[in-house]
């Protein structure tokens, strides 16, 4: 699997980390939705790292004339781009051509054959997921261990994948835990696990046995009408239309993926809630993308408004997409008031939080900005709610102008003094605990860094985070998820961790508040 990591880094990394050409802040009179559309339309698919099919087409037209192994790796890279764009069948078609090339060439290094079979197995397994987990989606689809309705109804592609990974383990030496793991997944998909997996490669069923007596949750999304397909995104579950039941809003990270609103129509005779999509009626047309979203009643009118966060993971080259503040009229209909509220901003972000930081009775807004290494450091925003529907950024004066590749922020009263403190999860550097020291003579809350004293700087490559009282002693405890060692296609540490083997992956942290 290491060769694949090299190709993906070479393909994506340069585009993601290249020094950006900074754009000027937009000041023209267009609406926020028009700004968003213009930004998305201006992105060049030839350079955008996630426009995989465009990149595959460009790569396919530029076949190298160098050494044989470089030619093969080039074709494998094109196949992976097609796979990343969702075209598993196209990837396999090109891989079949690579196989013929390898078979017609004498003395092919075993390592090159192994990389080929790993790539072929991944493409076949993905095709099986598309045909089954998506094409025949049900409550047990893609839930490990695969069983019942999770077993593939069309097992052909997964069976091909099973044979590929078994070959990698048995024919080339130096077997990897990642190949072992994928062999077992493919066997589950074809109902040949565990007995159909050779004992030396078998992942024992007890690996998936629960360690505690914890309730099992069933996936009712298909029955409820909310099994929406999309990329990773955010969600908000609350009563947005004021009828007493919980509605659902979901975003999706794709540049033109729609924001979706599912209205709760009540519980059916079988006890399952029923939802109806009302995205256009909710005013969501043109509200594209967003890896995350939050909700809160910023205007104190008794209903929940939305804030959509955009640009995450895209850097300052591609992530200059405006966020959106959507005001709820109380009946599940929303209006984009970003510009009128003074919140127009185009720096990439993944993380924000509503909270009454200045204790004046209305919700303020903290928005963290993602800054990759080598990019212009852009500080977080602390938008103080003026109480008239508008905000002002006072982050510098309040001590909240922190920077970094921020992947999560959360508010909580860690010292039980009645005001909200802030924790920021930063990927690639120590995290921050900023404790409020009180309201100053300027009327602003003031914060100071207490990270070292509290001992909560890790994990260094962290991700989502939240405060909660896990031990029910009245103090806010802190959970910080890790992404260290698990980035991208790096399956090996994930599999090793699940199997109880030593792993390079960085551990999550649960910090108990000792009061």
What are these regions (language model features)?
Residues 1-3:
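N-terminal secretory signal peptides that target proteins for export/translocation
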Residues 5-18:
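Bacterial N-terminal signal peptides
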Residues 23-63, 74, 81-515:
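Acidic, glycine/proline-rich Ca2+-coordinating loop motifs
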Residues 70, 79:
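Glycine/serine-rich loop-strand microenvironments at binding/catalytic pocket rims
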């Amino acid at each position: 699997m290491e060769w694949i990591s090299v190709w993906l880094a070479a393909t994506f990394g340069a585009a993601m980390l290249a020094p950006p050409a900074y754009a000027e802040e937009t000041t023209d009179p267009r609406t926020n939705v028009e700004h968003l559309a213009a930004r998305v339309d201006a992105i060049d698919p030839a350079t955008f790292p996630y426009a995989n099919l465009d990149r595959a087409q460009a790569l396919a037209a530029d076949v190298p004339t160098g050494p044989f192994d470089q030619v093969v790796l080039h074709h494998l890279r094109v196949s992976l781009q097609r796979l990343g764009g969702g075209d598993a069948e196209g990837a396999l078609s090109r891989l079949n051509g690579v196989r013929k090339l390898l078979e017609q060439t004498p003395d092919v290094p075993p390592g090159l054959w192994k990389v080929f079979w790993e790539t072929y197995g991944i493409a076949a397994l993905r095709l099986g997921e598309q045909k089954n987990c998506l094409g025949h989606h049900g409550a047990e689809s893609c839930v490990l261990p695969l069983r019942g309705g999770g077993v593939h109804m069309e097992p052909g592609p997964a069976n091909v994948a099973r044979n590929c990974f078994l070959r990698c383990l048995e024919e080339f030496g130096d077997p990897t835990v990642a190949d072992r793991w994928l062999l077992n997944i493919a066997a589950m998909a074809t109902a040949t696990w565990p007995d159909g997996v050779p004992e030396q490669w078998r992942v024992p069923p007890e690996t998936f046995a629960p360690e505690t007596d914890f309730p099992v949750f069933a996936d009712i999304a298909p029955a409820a009408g909310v099994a929406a397909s999309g990329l990773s995104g955010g969600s908000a579950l609350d009563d947005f239309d004021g009828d007493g039941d919980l509605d659902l809003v979901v975003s999706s990270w794709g540049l033109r993926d729609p924001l979706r609103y599912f209205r709760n129509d009540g519980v059916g005779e079988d006890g399952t809630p029923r939802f109806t999509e009302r995205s256009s009626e909710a005013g969501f047309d043109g509200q594209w993308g967003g890896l995350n979203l939050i909700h809160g009643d910023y205007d104190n009118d008794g209903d929940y408004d939305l804030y959509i966060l955009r640009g995450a993971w895209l850097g300052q080259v591609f992530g200059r997409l405006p966020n959106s503040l959507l005001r709820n009229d109380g009946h599940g209909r929303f209006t984009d008031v970003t510009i009128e509220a003074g919140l127009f901003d185009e720096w990439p972000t993944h993380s924000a939080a509503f909270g009454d930081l200045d204790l004046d009775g209305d919700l303020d807004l903290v928005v963290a900005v993602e800054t990759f290494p080598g990019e212009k450091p852009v500080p977080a925003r602390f938008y103080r709610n003026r109480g008239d529907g508008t905000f002002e950024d006072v982050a510098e004066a309040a001590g909240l102008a922190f920077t970094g590749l921020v992947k999560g922020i959360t508010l909580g009263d860690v010292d039980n003094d009645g005001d909200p403190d802030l924790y920021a999860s930063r990927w690639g550097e120590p995290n921050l605990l900023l404790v409020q020291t009180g309201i100053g003579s300027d009327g602003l809350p003031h914060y100071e860094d207490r990270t070292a004293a509290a001992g909560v700087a890790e994990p260094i490559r962290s991700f989502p985070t939240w405060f909660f009282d896990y031990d029910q002693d009245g103090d806010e405890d802190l959970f910080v998820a890790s992404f260290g060692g698990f980035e991208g296609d790096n399956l090996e540490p994930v599999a090793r961790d699940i199997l109880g083997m030593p792993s390079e992956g960085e551990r999550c942290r649960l910090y108990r508040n000792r009061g």
